[in-house]
């Protein structure tokens, strides 16, 4: 618990006190935000606001994670490093997108196709590493089961019994599944990052959930020798859950400090550099804690935001009419007359409620297992 609190404290301190320096630096080198021309007119004043603040979040989170472990003499575990791999990898994709926007002086960076391809180049190696990297007992960090609050009976490895074709099919399905989780997550967070502080505040709740989940899984881990006899049937086969909890806490703290400068009116924006990184970290945590489907609840706001875009496009293509005044959903409410800060705070409340529901479902699964 002390390591978790330290990680939060380090994260807050780093971003709270260093972000002003990066605001000045990014403004000086011309890393300014470009606003979509078809967006709400009141967003035009945000043009030129320093962007790529996600760099601050990523660096602060990683430093805070290592410092928290170092101060308490804890070993950095492969589970945390795997999350960092996805965190940094997706951040680099976002950084490339942001750099292209700055150089082209346009709100369009990487095209959708190239963005998904690059995201897949991060997600697929991550999926392979979760099996290739094993703990001290020789157990991989992931399984081929689809998970909710723990692994379910849906297991791609059941295809192994079909011989070489079955083994090949199982691996392809597993890689596609992990890629779907990762790509969906990073793009959902990116879609949500359209108002000052919205994505950062919502992700704080998601990271809080993974702090709680990782800490609980650590106490109820199957590898613990001191586990009460009555809890053995409920234990979690998760590698390094406490380490992931510490990393989630570091990200949470970094977001809290960053939000001080990112809230309306924003002095700096995280850009795709931050949004893709956060989506990648959340996806990695859901995979490594075996809570893949539960992530749909924990990140419910991101699901709604991404879903509003999908619905808008599909409905318009079929009926030539729009469901919303504008998608994503937060822009719809802006055009309905809601103030930006009103939309953000109400969406934060929704994100918090989804997180509470998700943690409740997680605990209920343990209670009734």
Curated annotation (Swiss-Prot):
It catalyses: UDP-N-acetyl-alpha-D-muramoyl-L-alanyl-gamma-D-glutamyl-meso-2,6-diaminopimeloyl-D-alanyl-D-alanine + di-trans,octa-cis-undecaprenyl phosphate = di-trans,octa-cis-undecaprenyl diphospho-N-acetyl-alpha-D-muramoyl-L-alanyl-D-glutamyl-meso-2,6-diaminopimeloyl-D-alanyl-D-alanine + UMP. The keyword RNA-binding does not apply. GO terms for biological process: cell division; cell wall organization; peptidoglycan biosynthetic process; regulation of cell shape. The chain crosses the membrane at residues 2-22, 54-74, 80-100, 113-133, 158-178, 195-215, 241-261, 268-288, 293-313, 347-367. Its cofactor is Mg(2+). Pathway: Cell wall biogenesis; peptidoglycan biosynthesis. It is a multi-pass membrane protein. GO terms for molecular function: metal ion binding; phospho-N-acetylmuramoyl-pentapeptide-transferase activity; UDP-N-acetylmuramoyl-L-alanyl-D-glutamyl-meso-2,6-diaminopimelyl-D-alanyl-D-alanine:undecaprenyl-phosphate transferase activity. Belongs to the glycosyltransferase 4 family. MraY subfamily. Catalyzes the initial step of the lipid cycle reactions in the biosynthesis of the cell wall peptidoglycan: transfers peptidoglycan precursor phospho-MurNAc-pentapeptide from UDP-MurNAc-pentapeptide onto the lipid carrier undecaprenyl phosphate, yielding undecaprenyl-pyrophosphoryl-MurNAc-pentapeptide, known as lipid I. This is Phospho-N-acetylmuramoyl-pentapeptide-transferase. The gene is mraY.
């Amino acid at each position: 618990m002390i390591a978790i609190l330290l990680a939060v404290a380090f994260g807050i301190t780093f971003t709270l006190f260093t972000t002003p320096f990066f605001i000045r630096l990014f403004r000086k080198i011309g890393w300014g935000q470009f606003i979509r021309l078809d967006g709400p007119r009141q967003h035009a004043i945000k043009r030129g606001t320093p962007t790529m603040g996600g760099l601050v979040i990523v660096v602060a989170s990683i430093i805070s994670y290592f410092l928290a472990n170092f101060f308490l003499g804890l070993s950095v575990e492969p589970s945390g490093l795997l999350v960092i791999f996805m965190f940094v990898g997706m951040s680099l994709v976002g950084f490339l997108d942001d750099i292209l926007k700055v150089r082209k002086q346009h709100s369009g960076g990487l095209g959708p196709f190239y963005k998904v391809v690059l995201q897949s180049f991060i997600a697929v190696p991550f999926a392979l590493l979760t099996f290739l990297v094993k703990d001290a007992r020789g157990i991989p960090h992931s399984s081929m089961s689809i998970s909710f609050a723990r692994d379910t009976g849906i297991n791609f490895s059941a295809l192994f019994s079909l011989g070489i074709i079955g083994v090949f099919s199982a691996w392809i399905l597993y890689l596609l599944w992990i890629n779907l989780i990762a790509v969906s997550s990073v793009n959902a967070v990116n879609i949500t990052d359209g108002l000052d502080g919205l994505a950062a505040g919502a992700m704080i709740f998601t990271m809080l959930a993974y702090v709680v989940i990782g800490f609980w899984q650590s106490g109820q881990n199957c590898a613990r020798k001191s586990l009460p006899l009555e809890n053995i049937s409920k234990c979690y086969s998760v590698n390094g859950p406490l380490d992931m909890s510490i990393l989630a806490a570091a990200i949470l703290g970094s977001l809290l400090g960053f939000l001080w400068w990112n809230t309306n009116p924003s002095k700096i924006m995280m850009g795709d550099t931050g949004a893709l990184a956060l989506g990648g970290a959340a996806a990695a945590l859901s995979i490594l804690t075996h809570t893949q489907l539960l992530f749909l609840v924990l990140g419910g706001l991101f699901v709604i935001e991404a879903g509003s875009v999908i619905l808008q496009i599909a409905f318009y293509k079929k009926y030539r009419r729009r469901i919303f005044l504008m998608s994503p959903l937060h822009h719809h409410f802006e055009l309905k007359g809601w103030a930006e800060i009103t939309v953000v705070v109400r969406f934060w409340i929704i994100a918090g409620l989804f997180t509470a529901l998700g943690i409740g479902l997680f605990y209920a699964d343990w209670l009734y297992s």
